[in-house]
């Protein structure tokens, strides 16, 4: 089978992980295995743990990683459960972990998943098809206040009140069933000037609903905490984000990992006992170059941040 998936910032991620052929690595967002293939083929006696909440990704990876399955373990799970996954896999410490956040290209391209505002499909948006909450429930059941909040907080949508009001008004007549129905409602709630902007008028709203359905932002803090705790000294944590909300959480978490004593400056000696867990290797995020952007426009918003577990911090 021809392999055409283009993983974002691939070379930069491999360099960031500073790989050893006998190391233990975690790809916490397997997707279509683009990064995992590159990691797996660099291992000899090492091991790769691949995690994804989307069973379709796990199934596809069995073929795409077939030549290296002797060193690969596939796990169907949410990366928020990273600590438990590592324990279950018998991993006492990893030498590198990679997380490529957000919705994957195959999920966007499969209209039936309901992620796209360009193709008609039932309102779903679940990354894990076995999860109970769908976009249909969010759109048709959640209150005006809840809708306005997620549109504003998760979508950074300045027309959140008007869009939330339009959704509630529309569903009073009949349930909103499909993605393009929702797109029309969103467009109808926005002023003409907003419809002429370069960005699709439904992009921010769809992002907000998707984040709410999948609990994406809520999963980040426990994952980041478990990741740094699960690294061996000198191990690397690499995280790719695609929008400012994710990037802000990752940036602050890594800054906190690198921060030592938090005692007030007037204290003569440290009493908090806090020591840095990691050091930042990227003061500014790594972004895609022009060559990658020409081949893969979806890489335009990608930002890679990297931290390294401190040698003097015990697991």
Predicted regions and their residues:
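S-adenosyl-L-methionine-dependent methyltransferase catalytic core, i.e., the SAM/SAH-binding region
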Residues: 1-315
């Amino acid at each position: 089978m021809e392999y055409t998936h283009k993983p974002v910032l691939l070379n930069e991620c491999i360099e960031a992980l500073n790989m050893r052929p006998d190391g233990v690595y975690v790809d916490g967002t397997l997707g279509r295995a683009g990064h995992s293939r590159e990691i797996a083929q660099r291992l000899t006696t090492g091991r790769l743990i691949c995690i994804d909440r989307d069973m379709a990704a796990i199934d596809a990876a069995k073929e795409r990683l077939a030549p290296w399955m002797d060193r690969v373990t596939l796990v169907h799970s949410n990366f928020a459960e990273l600590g438990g996954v590592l324990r279950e896999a018998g991993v006492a410490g990893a030498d590198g972990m990679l997380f490529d956040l957000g919705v994957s290209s195959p999920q966007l391209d499969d209209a039936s998943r309901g992620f796209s505002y360009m193709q008609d499909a039932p309102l779903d948006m679940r990354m894990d098809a076995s999860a109970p909450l769908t976009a249909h429930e969010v759109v048709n059941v959640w209150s005006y206040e809840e809708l306005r909040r997620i549109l504003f907080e998760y979508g950074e949508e300045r027309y959140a009140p008007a869009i939330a009001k339009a959704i509630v008004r529309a569903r009073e007549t009949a349930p909103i069933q499909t993605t393009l129905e929702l797109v029309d409602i969103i467009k109808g709630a926005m002023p003409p000037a907003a419809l002429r902007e370069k960005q699709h008028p439904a992009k921010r709203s769809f992002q907000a609903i998707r984040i709410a359905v999948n609990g994406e932002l809520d999963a980040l803090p426990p994952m980041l905490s478990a990741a740094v705790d699960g690294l061996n000294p000198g191990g690397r944590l690499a995280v790719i984000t695609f929008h400012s909300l994710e990037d802000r959480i990752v940036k602050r978490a890594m800054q906190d990992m690198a921060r030592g004593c938090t005692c007030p400056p007037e204290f003569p000696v440290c009493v908090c006992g806090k020591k840095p867990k990691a050091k930042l290797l990227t003061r500014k995020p790594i972004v895609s170059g022009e060559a990658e952007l020409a081949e893969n426009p979806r890489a335009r918003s990608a930002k890679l941040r990297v931290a390294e577990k401190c040698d003097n911090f015990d697991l």
